[in-house]
Amino acid sequence: MKIKTFGLLMIILLSGCSSLQFNQNQTHTIIDWVDFVKLNGNMYTSDWGIVLKHENDVAEEVGEVSFTVDEVVTDPGYRTKDGDAAFLDIGTKLYRVKGFGTDELIAVADDTRVNGYKLYIQDQFRSSMINRYDEIPKDKVNSIGLYCDNESKPYKTLTGKDINKFIKLLDDGVYSPNYSPNMNNGDPLYYLMVFYTDDPIGNSFSIADDSQNVYFYPDSTRIVDSEIRDWIEQ
């Protein structure tokens, strides 16, 4: 059922239409929506991997959400339209981000995200963004912010020589794709590390401490030397 639902979802988001016919007695489908918003004919989806560098990098309002589809739309043949969003409340304002066109990136206020905004990437523009840790231009990183889960402000910011030391610990980590977190002491502690350059957005990655190991996910699990606890602990 999940495979069929995913296929139908892709039809809705990518083509916006479906040739499937449904009779009046057919049971409605529960659609597993991705976190999207549609504006000016463009489809945008949220991404935890990019964050706003400064609050004042948000520019003018460019639209607002007029309809929330989650738990309302059950027809797999539904055509998304401008103003539709999966989970954003009706009336949510959409903003341009300085340095980007509205056909590339937009922002919405969210006090659980870094610097108070959640970013949505236009689907075709996504391929031009940094998606992997190894793609970060590390020689251009001028600060690293460390955040607790769902906090908008950092509890620690690394600058200067500390940046190189921290990155070296990450780079020297050991790939362990089959690693299973130690749950003997409960859930691991999760932190967010955000790499900032001169660009108006930063790149974020989760790092976790399960009391046995510290690890992160550059593409697959990488276990980092325990020395990194000196940096990530509050």
What are these model-derived regions, one by one?
Residues 1-7:
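Positively charged n-region of N-terminal signal peptides that target proteins for export
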Residues 13-16:
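C-terminal motif of bacterial Sec signal peptides marking the signal peptidase cleavage site
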Residues 18-234:
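Function-determining sites in protein domains
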